[in-house]
Structures are given as structure tokens and as C-alpha cells.
Amino acid sequence: MIKNKKQKSYTSVYALGQYISMSAHKARRVIDQIRGRSYEEALMILELMPYRGCYPIFKLVYSAAANASHNKGFKETNLVISKAEVNQGNTVKKLKPRARGRSYPIKRSTCHITIVLEDTSFYQQYEEYLMYLKKPGYSNENRNLTCYDTYSSGGLWDKK
């Protein structure tokens, strides 16, 4: 088995929350709302959303920002949530006692949440240089894309 070695990223930090007692499906509903947004905007959204899953995700985003400012010295205003993923964790199985000596199984699902924050100040510094590297005259307007539709081409099927 070949393992890909992870390269160090100098512009991103992450926070990982494991075994959070919530189903992965419910956590994904909240994560989809904040993916790709800035750090401050994500905190506001998480504070105002009425779901139970918002609080653990809020703590994770806040922890990732604390990692960014403490470990790498990034400013919180330049942070953007570049990657947010939810994976299914273990399912804790218990038995609930019921009447007449019976018992019903209870499944308590957990999930693992990963939040990756990226610093955008690097891109703002070198924005002019990156624009210079782009080829001049290459844009979507200059490409001539024509779609040939077989039904409106005046072929056999147009005549009745």
C-alpha cells in the first residue's frame, strides 16, 4: 500500500473534533452553510442558526482560528474556511429496558468534523504578480464556442 505524504501548507491550519455525539447527516446540514465563507461571517451564521449541531461546530471554528493566530500568527480577519468535512464516527449501541423483560436497542451515532482555515493575506500580497503571470488576451470572451444542435440543423427530422 502506497501512502501519499502530506505536504506542509504554510497558509492553512485545521481543527479536528472527534466523537461528537451527533449524526453525520445533521452535522453536514450545518457545515454546508459555512463552507467557503470568511471566519467572522461563519461565526455569525453559527450563532444565529437554530440547530443543536451549531454549538460544537462553532467551538471547532473558534479553535481553528485560535490555532491560526497562536501557532502561525495569522490575523483572524483574513481567514476563510477552505475545507470543512464531516465523517461518520463510531455508533454506540445500548439496550433500553422495556416492559415485560424486553429491551430495545438504542443507536447513538457520532461523527468526526474537520475544519480547515486558510489565510488569504498571502494571495492579496501577490495578486498583481499573479495577474501578470496570466496570459494576456486569454478570456472566455475570446473563445469561439459554437454548439451544433442536431435537431435544429435543418436535417431530416425537421421536415414532416
Curated annotation (Swiss-Prot):
Location within or outside the cell: Plastid, Chloroplast
Main location: plastid
An example molecular function term from Gene Ontology annotations: structural constituent of ribosome
Keywords for the protein's UniProt record, in alphabetical order: Chloroplast, Plastid, Ribonucleoprotein, Ribosomal protein, RNA-binding, rRNA-binding
Superkingdom of source: Eukaryota
Any single GO BP term: translation
This protein's GO CC annotations: chloroplast; large ribosomal subunit
Family of this protein: Belongs to the universal ribosomal protein uL22 family.
Stated role: This protein binds specifically to 23S rRNA.
UniProt cross-references to NCBIfam families, sorted A to Z: rplV_bact
Assembly and binders: Part of the 50S ribosomal subunit.
Name this protein carries in UniProt: Large ribosomal subunit protein uL22c
Species this protein is from: Arabis hirsuta (Hairy rock-cress)
